[in-house]
Amino acid sequence: MDVVAKLDEKKMTTPDEGGWSPRDNLAHLTEWMNSMMGYHMDKRPPHEVMRISEEATRGWDMEVINPELFERNKDRSTQDVLDELKRTYETVLAKLESTPFEDLMKPRHAHDPEKRPLLMWVIGDTSGHFEEHRQVIERML
């Protein structure tokens, strides 16, 4: 959040060349944290968790999913996005603290030949994803 603290309201809502503002990036991260908890940790159907069509989640096509998430969030206020981001992050932390480490190390998908652990998906939708979008936001400074 250090990089976000450097942004005033104008910078928070100014889109980059791809059309996303820092606020849009933060709303996107919140969507994916919620998705990670609902789909990966709670094992609910992805389309229900993400509130998008089942067809969109079937192939995990980010060129379909991410624009839908963007459209849903683009008109939200900066404060609303920041408040939800904070609440969601706190929920992620609480959920991880209450999950036994052994469960995080179990394969997420029974059909995965690589037997990748749940923890890999958690990292991908949290710290790995945060880093990616932090870099995007920093380029806008």
What do the PLM-derived regions correspond to, one by one?
Residues 1-5, 33-41, 86-100, 131-134, ...:
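Structural signal for well-ordered, non-membrane alpha-helices
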Residues 1-21:
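Long, hydrophobic N-terminal alpha-helical segment
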Residues 8, 86, 115-116:
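Short hydrophobic/aromatic segments of transmembrane alpha-helices and their interfaces
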Residues 14-15, 70, 81, 122:
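Generic anion/oxyanion-binding catalytic loop in active/binding sites
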Residues 15-64, 104-141:
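Short, contiguous alpha-helical
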Residues 58-104:
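Acidic/histidine-rich alpha-helical segments that form the ligand environment
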